């Protein structure tokens, strides 16, 4: 289907609306003017007919002359006097332009009729005349030629006015629509450039229209977000590829070692297999964490949300952790108030264990971890504190980025992929919470989770 341009549609619609509106308005004006003018013509004819009647009452018929009759007539009028036997007695007019033969039907028509003769309309008024010395009637013939010419002129003026107004409207619409669509054309061209060249360029528009400027600003913001998302996706792929490449290279190296020496040396075979299995487990864990970040149902928290009793869940997890890490001291300071939150139970367990696991990894010396809960201004607050190496201030804004690790060598030796805190932050945000961090080098770190 062929699509029309917005500018052309705008011009056509506005022009047609203007033309129809003006034309209808002119027709209404002409209708009232016609009625007013017609009534004026009828009044003139009635006045002349009445003057003729008064003339016959003012003097005897024998004393009435054509000059007397003409004095009672207006322009473009003719008078014919008949006696009671329909015999014509007088016929005269002020000029020779009105010469209408009313015909025999004048004996039977009503007082006022309209007749067309040789392309001209006439009003004919029949007026009875009864005096002491005369009995008959008069026919006043009033030409409507002037009236018809005025009406025709009004129609021509209305049409001309409509055409002129339409041309002016079309011109204004063309200029205005060009100004309106120019930013849209620039926007379209910019999209084509971005599709071809990438996100380097931004839309630079400065118009007098707030809506267009808002559209341009929204487009630039959207492009910035898309560019940021694209860069994040590219960085994510690069980081994921890097994280997968290292264990795969290690596995490949040990498989080559097994192929070369492992067949004859059981010690080499055992060591290479153990390392390969360890690296394979690392890959499996990395893939699981990546799936956790990207799986489609992570945003649907309402369908499986349940009431989670925060203190009970923490006590249960701490009990298990004490069995798993007997060399660590886990202290709790849980509020006596009932803390509840609506979320998926496994998500709360997951984010809690992420922070505990992070504390364990970076507190290998003091091995003391404290968990505290409290209720403040209807906010449920969970604080997890370790006494480890701490996080430098310049790194604190980036620790929730995917694959970001403060000490890459230490994290790798401890099995970290740099995804745990990203997953925890995402879970917290999906459930309407927030997270804060407070850390000092060689003194420890406190993560504050707020729901």
UniProtKB/Swiss-Prot annotation:
<feature type="transmembrane region" description="Helical">
    <location>
        <begin position="156"/>
        <end position="176"/>
    </location>
</feature>
<keyword id="KW-0418">Kinase</keyword>
<keyword id="KW-1133">Transmembrane helix</keyword>
<keyword id="KW-0812">Transmembrane</keyword>
<keyword id="KW-0902">Two-component regulatory system</keyword>
<dbReference type="InterPro" id="IPR003660">
    <property type="entry name" value="HAMP_dom"/>
</dbReference>
<keyword id="KW-0843">Virulence</keyword>
<dbReference type="GO" id="GO:0005524">
    <property type="term" value="F:ATP binding"/>
</dbReference>
<keyword id="KW-0067">ATP-binding</keyword>
<dbReference type="GO" id="GO:0005886">
    <property type="term" value="C:plasma membrane"/>
</dbReference>
<keyword id="KW-0597">Phosphoprotein</keyword>
<dbReference type="InterPro" id="IPR036890">
    <property type="entry name" value="HATPase_C_sf"/>
</dbReference>
<feature type="modified residue" description="Phosphohistidine; by autocatalysis">
    <location>
        <position position="242"/>
    </location>
</feature>
<comment type="function">
    <text>Member of the two-component regulatory system ArlS/ArlR involved in the regulation of adhesion, autolysis, multidrug resistance and virulence. ArlS probably functions as a sensor protein kinase which is autophosphorylated at a histidine residue and transfers its phosphate group to ArlR.</text>
</comment>
<dbReference type="InterPro" id="IPR036097">
    <property type="entry name" value="HisK_dim/P_sf"/>
</dbReference>
<keyword id="KW-0808">Transferase</keyword>
<dbReference type="Pfam" id="PF02518">
    <property type="entry name" value="HATPase_c"/>
</dbReference>
<feature type="domain" description="Histidine kinase">
    <location>
        <begin position="239"/>
        <end position="451"/>
    </location>
</feature>
<dbReference type="InterPro" id="IPR004358">
    <property type="entry name" value="Sig_transdc_His_kin-like_C"/>
</dbReference>
<dbReference type="Pfam" id="PF18719">
    <property type="entry name" value="ArlS_N"/>
</dbReference>
<dbReference type="GO" id="GO:0000155">
    <property type="term" value="F:phosphorelay sensor kinase activity"/>
</dbReference>
<feature type="domain" description="HAMP">
    <location>
        <begin position="178"/>
        <end position="231"/>
    </location>
</feature>
<protein>
    <recommendedName>
        <fullName>Signal transduction histidine-protein kinase ArlS</fullName>
        <ecNumber>2.7.13.3</ecNumber>
    </recommendedName>
</protein>
<keyword id="KW-0472">Membrane</keyword>
<keyword id="KW-0547">Nucleotide-binding</keyword>
<dbReference type="InterPro" id="IPR050398">
    <property type="entry name" value="Bact_Sensor_His_Kinase"/>
</dbReference>
<keyword id="KW-1003">Cell membrane</keyword>
<dbReference type="InterPro" id="IPR003661">
    <property type="entry name" value="HisK_dim/P_dom"/>
</dbReference>
<dbReference type="InterPro" id="IPR005467">
    <property type="entry name" value="His_kinase_dom"/>
</dbReference>
<dbReference type="InterPro" id="IPR041610">
    <property type="entry name" value="ArlS_N"/>
</dbReference>
<feature type="transmembrane region" description="Helical">
    <location>
        <begin position="11"/>
        <end position="31"/>
    </location>
</feature>
<dbReference type="Pfam" id="PF00512">
    <property type="entry name" value="HisKA"/>
</dbReference>
